[in-house]
Amino acid sequence: MVQDGNPPDDNVFRAFCNALYNTVDAPVTWFRETVVEPNQKKYPWYHQNYRRVPTIDQCYDDDVVCDFEANAQFKRDRAVDSEILSILRQRYEDCMMYEQPDHATKCRSLWDKYKSAEEAWFIKYGDLGAYGDARKAYMKQKHRMVWERRNGPLSDLTK
């Protein structure tokens, strides 16, 4: 008897082991393919939502794990914000190429959205450098808030 495209097995012991295996495996495989898999939600791995972890201001000074999680969350947020900014820039560039003679008027709304998002990104992540982490960003935010309390707002986004 040929199973799964393999030639028949001449060894009696292996044939017995395969028969025993198939008596257990066949009902399990049938149940999984006919009952479990059709009722499962198809959820791609790239749509995974991560839970929010405590921010750096909620961590204790000696809590290394909380610091690590806050930095990982900060890096994820920076990557998402950078990708949003890149998408807005690409939309503006596409509009500019498509509407070439009057792109200044037709793409103005995209330009305003991009500049607003760029300003918000720079307020949060600008001047941190390549090795900026959550604690440095928190200190930057704290110093900016102190400066604005003394001298007034720097931007329309921080009023």
From Swiss-Prot:
It holds the Pfam family NDUFB10. Signal peptide: none annotated. Keywords: Electron transport, Membrane, Mitochondrion, Mitochondrion inner membrane, Respiratory chain, Transport. It is found in: Mitochondrion inner membrane. Coiled coil: none annotated. It is a peripheral membrane protein. PANTHER family: NADH DEHYDROGENASE [UBIQUINONE] 1 BETA SUBCOMPLEX SUBUNIT 10, NADH-UBIQUINONE OXIDOREDUCTASE PDSW SUBUNIT. Complex I is composed of 45 different subunits. Accessory subunit of the mitochondrial membrane respiratory chain NADH dehydrogenase (Complex I), that is believed not to be involved in catalysis. Complex I functions in the transfer of electrons from NADH to the respiratory chain. The immediate electron acceptor for the enzyme is believed to be ubiquinone. Belongs to the complex I NDUFB10 subunit family. This is NADH dehydrogenase [ubiquinone] 1 beta subcomplex subunit 10. It comes from Bombyx mori.
